Amino acid sequence: KFKIYIGMIAGVGKSYRMLQEAHEMLENGVDVQIGYIETHGRAGTVAMLEGLPVISRKKIFYKGKEVEEMDLDAILQLHPELVIVDELAHTNIEGSRNEKRWQDVMELLDAGINVISAVNIQHIESLNEDVKGIAGIEVKERIPDKVLQDADEVVNIDLTAEELINRLKAGKIYRPEKIQLALNNFFKTENILQLRELALKEVAFRVEKKVENEIVTGEKGIRHEK
């Protein structure tokens, strides 16, 4: 099974929710591992990692610097029932087996490992232009819409504009020196309202498509018994 948490913008709580779910699964006896999580130094997210089994990241030297990537082979070898993989749109370092993290996820799913992942709407290929129109930002890292189509479940982490701005002002999203800049740019109330609407529409569209597919598949599988 493949589940994706979608967010309208950074800081809505996708990573936190995934870790929350990992704790719930662990308590229910599920073999869950953290394949990759991006805490962004947020205290709440860091605290949620406590008590969860984390697969060490792979250290790679690239252009004279040590960088860390998700260790795909280690996950495949451990073969947990469920793995948490954050930052679905991430581009892997040059020389990695797959160019994109979503391709790593496909490999994990093919190996029979359940995956929970997360992405913000600006990284979805078909919504890229819409987000650019709303916020004036073009994002280079994108995932094809097919990745969302392949998901068994797409869940929107929804917050009101007021809740999100309060989180930002309280220092729960960015460091203090970045807060004002964010409020003046991406985190303007009118931007958030439009991005929120976009995220809600996208998830509604995905659910509708899934229901349509299930009806078609169900009809094919109906046996008429006398």
Language-model features: where?
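Conserved RecA-like ASCE ATPase "motif II neighborhood" in helicase/translocase motors
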Residues: 62-87, 98-101, 135-138
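Conserved P-loop
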Residues: 2-77
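Long, charged amphipathic helices and adjacent flexible linkers at domain junctions
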Residues: 179-225
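Conserved ATPase-coupling elements of RecA-like P-loop NTPase cores
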Residues: 87-102, 126-129
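Short, glycine-rich nucleotide/cofactor-binding loops
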Residues: 6-15, 93-96, 220-226
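Internal gly/pro-rich beta-alpha loop/helix module
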Residues: 117-180
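Loop/turn-to-beta-strand initiation segments
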Residues: 31, 79-82, 111-117
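Substrate-engagement module of ASCE P-loop NTPases
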Residues: 100-120, 143
